[in-house]
Amino acid sequence: MSSIALGVNIDHIATLRNARNTEYPDLVEIANIAVNNGADFITVHLREDRRHIRDSDVFRLKDNLNVPLNLEIAAIDEMLAIAIAVQPECVCLVPEKRQELTTEGGLDVKNMFTYLMPFVTQLHNHNIKVTLFVEPDINQINYAKKLSVDNIELHTGVYCNHNTQNELNRILEAAKHCYTNKIECHAGHGLDYQSAATIARVPYISALNIGHFLICEAVLHGIGTSIYKMKKVITNPL
């Protein structure tokens, strides 16, 4: 199988920084440590409430990274304008609720189709690739295909929480459907070493996005060591 890419989400480095409103830990420094230890791209989620990542973080990361920046945003005009100004390599459109602790599920592309269309078009007009974060659902992927998005990121949270064969089968079928429809397939949410190794074995998934678990592991083992181990786990799954 071809090597799978690792996207490291550093949102919770910003959470730690913001706890005391300090300038440290520095996100650019952490991002570059991640890259030096196997991260193929860096992911950040600029939320409407700015609970972790700030606007200035996104611009600094874009200006100081030698790997692609993957910017997660809600599909709203404010975030679209920021994305166009930043010019990340890719924007991942995600659902967002102010009271949620983290993203709770995928976009309902079917019901949001007309609403999402101008966002996808404008991002493409500025040469920014577009990913949609969706549940492993064939119907949702069909509507994403109609929007001509570049990538799908499958929500792995349900699988990670329940570890059922039925949910893994949904991911397998969704990844194959992406391949059949010529959409690059990524996956993420809730992944740890064990679940990431399983998802990395799924044919047609080309990248994983992992954040919270790696930051927690970094408290015990250091950010570089944790990312190096994860990259080894997903590129050589048992």
UniProtKB/Swiss-Prot annotation:
Cellular localisation: Cytoplasm
Site residues by UniProt (Transition state stabilizer): 153
Family as reported in the entry's similarity comment: Belongs to the PNP synthase family.
Residues annotated to bind 3-amino-2-oxopropyl phosphate: 9, 20, 190, 211-212
Binding site for 1-deoxy-D-xylulose 5-phosphate: 11-12, 47, 52, 102
Catalytic activity annotation: 3-amino-2-oxopropyl phosphate + 1-deoxy-D-xylulose 5-phosphate = pyridoxine 5'-phosphate + phosphate + 2 H2O + H(+)
Gene3D superfamilies: Aldolase class I (3.20.20.70)
UniProt cross-references to Pfam families, sorted A to Z: PdxJ
Name of the protein in its database record: Pyridoxine 5'-phosphate synthase
Principal location listed in the UniProt entry: cytoplasm
Keywords for the protein's UniProt record, in alphabetical order: Cytoplasm, Pyridoxine biosynthesis, Transferase
GO MF, any single term: pyridoxine 5'-phosphate synthase activity
One GO term describing the cellular component: cytosol
Pathway as given in its UniProt record: Cofactor biosynthesis; pyridoxine 5'-phosphate biosynthesis; pyridoxine 5'-phosphate from D-erythrose 4-phosphate: step 5/5
PANTHER family linked to this entry: PYRIDOXINE 5'-PHOSPHATE SYNTHASE
The keyword NADP belongs to this UniProt entry's keyword annotation: no
NCBIfam families membership: pdxJ, PRK05265.1-3, PRK05265.1-5
